[in-house]
């Protein structure tokens, strides 16, 4: 076998010495003349001539992988832009609900101030001994959003175990497919599940608030806690927990709010957060006569307020999910670009190695004939 390999190499070298032009591809020179690859001519044909390089399987595999990585980068960039458009939509939805929310908060604050301590006897404002808690957990419906869902699930599990260690019974109301799938597979006590999608509306929030009110007023639960992801910026979000029911009159009348706005500059996205002023309680004169008893008015306002709070947290959770997806897709695009550069370098090295190997074979064959 070695003899045949050496004989083949010598035959190739002899053929190269006899007709070296046959081992190269070239373009015709001006006037139809041809030139040899070893010619010292400086004609355009000589400058445009390219040697035929036989690439090995490794180089071809690298080239195919470069193409695949570049196509993946295009997909991730498109997903980032889609997420940015949906964040703007969520932003507009939050701004659209602000006038009603501010007016409701102002009227409620005025009624609380007018009634004084009498309002604290309402069922939804009364603090009672807690023996069972309902956790409302908001997660996303899809993945590809970094640690958004996993952080929220870990927060819910930690709170569930904390209440269990304190001897407090606990069940869950789950919102979002990821959380539903996770907790159902692990056998957690689940009261009810909801799927709101990426465009939550007031009807969906109303269905959730009615379920929570019925649970609390019927005595099946002594407190309702809401776990959601607070939207901070495009690169940061915070799993948050708050007591949803019973209400705290002081929090309703004093707690501020924030509105986020997504802006773009030079192809980059930024978030501007504006802290809104607290809605001042409406001043009701002492001689004002209410057609209905103020207690009945407050009982009617509280479900509306709960509905608004749930809708707001749903919208904020959606914005956090989309922002996390934007950041995740941006990171994926950057990583794809870096990987494509490394693969291009590796491909060029493989190509250069193939050229060097061919030259060495030719030179070795020519030397063997001398």
From Swiss-Prot:
Q: Which InterPro entries match?
A: ATP_synth_F1_ATPase_gsu, ATP_synth_F1_gsu, ATP_synth_F1_gsu_CS
Active-site residues from the entry: 145
Keywords of the record = ATP synthesis, CF(1), Chloroplast, Hydrogen ion transport, Ion transport, Membrane, Plastid, Thylakoid, Transit peptide, Transport
Q: Which GO terms describe its cellular component?
A: chloroplast thylakoid membrane; proton-transporting ATP synthase complex
Asked if the keyword Endoplasmic reticulum belongs to this entry, the reply reads no
The answer to whether UniProt assigns keyword tRNA-binding to this entry is no
Q: Any idea which residues the transit peptide spans?
A: 1-55
Cross-referenced Pfam families: ATP-synt
MF terms per GO, please?
A: proton-transporting ATP synthase activity, rotational mechanism
Q: How does it sit in the membrane?
A: Peripheral membrane protein
The compartments listed are: Plastid, Chloroplast thylakoid membrane
* SUPFAM superfamilies noted in UniProt: ATP synthase (F1-ATPase), gamma subunit (SSF52943)
UniProt cross-references to Gene3D superfamilies, sorted A to Z: 3.40.1380.10, ATP synthase, gamma subunit, helix hairpin domain
Q: Which NCBIfam families match?
A: ATPsyn_F1gamma, PRK05621.1-2
Give the function comment from the record.
Produces ATP from ADP in the presence of a proton gradient across the membrane. The gamma chain is believed to be important in regulating ATPase activity and the flow of protons through the CF(0) complex.
Q: Which family does it belong to?
A: Belongs to the ATPase gamma chain family.
On subunit structure and binding partners, the annotation says: F-type ATPases have 2 components, CF(1) - the catalytic core - and CF(0) - the membrane proton channel. CF(1) has five subunits: alpha(3), beta(3), gamma(1), delta(1), epsilon(1). CF(0) has four main subunits: a, b, b' and c.
Please report the name of this protein according to its UniProt entry. Answer: ATP synthase gamma chain, chloroplastic
Please name the source species: Trieres chinensis
């Amino acid at each position: 076998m070695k003899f045949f390999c050496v004989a083949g190499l010598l035959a190739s070298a002899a053929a190269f010495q006899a007709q070296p032009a046959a081992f190269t591809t070239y373009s015709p020179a001006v006037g139809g003349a041809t030139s040899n690859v070893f010619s010292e001519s400086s004609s355009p044909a000589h400058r445009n001539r390219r040697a035929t390089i036989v690439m090995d399987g490794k180089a071809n595999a690298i080239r195919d992988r470069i193409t695949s990585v570049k196509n993946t980068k295009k997909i991730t960039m498109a997903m980032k832009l889609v997420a940015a458009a949906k964040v703007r939509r969520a932003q507009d939805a939050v701004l659209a609900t602000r006038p009603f929310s501010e007016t409701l908060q102002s009227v409620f604050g005025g009624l609380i101030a007018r009634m004084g301590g009498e309002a604290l006897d309402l069922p939804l404002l009364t603090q009672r001994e807690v023996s069972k808690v309902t956790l409302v957990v908001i997660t996303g419906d899809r993945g590809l959003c970094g640690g958004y869902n996993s952080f929220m699930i870990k927060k819910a599990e930690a709170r569930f175990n904390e209440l269990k260690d304190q001897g407090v019974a606990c069940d869950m109301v789950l919102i979002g497919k990821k959380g539903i799938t996770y907790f159902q597979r692990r056998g957690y006590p689940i009261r009810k599940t909801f799927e709101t999608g990426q465009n939550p509306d007031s009807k969906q929030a109303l269905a959730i608030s009615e379920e929570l009110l019925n649970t609390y007023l019927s005595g099946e639960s002594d407190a309702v806690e809401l776990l959601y992801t607070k939207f901070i910026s495009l690169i940061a979000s915070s799993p948050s927990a708050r007591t949803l029911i019973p209400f705290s009159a002081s929090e309703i009348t004093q707690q501020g709010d924030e509105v986020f706005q997504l802006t773009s500059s030079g192809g980059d996205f930024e978030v501007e957060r504006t802290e809104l002023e607290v809605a001042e309680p409406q001043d009701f004169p002492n001689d004002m006569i209410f057609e209905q008893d103020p207690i009945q008015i407050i009982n009617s306002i509280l479900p509306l307020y709960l509905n608004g709070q749930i809708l707001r947290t749903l919208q904020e959770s959606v914005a956090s999910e989309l922002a996390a997806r934007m950041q995740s897709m941006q990171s994926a695009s950057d990583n794809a670009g870096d990987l494509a550069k490394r693969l291009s370098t590796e491909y060029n090295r493989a190509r250069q190695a193939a050229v060097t190997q061919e030259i060495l074979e030719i030179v070795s064959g020519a030397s063997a004939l001398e």
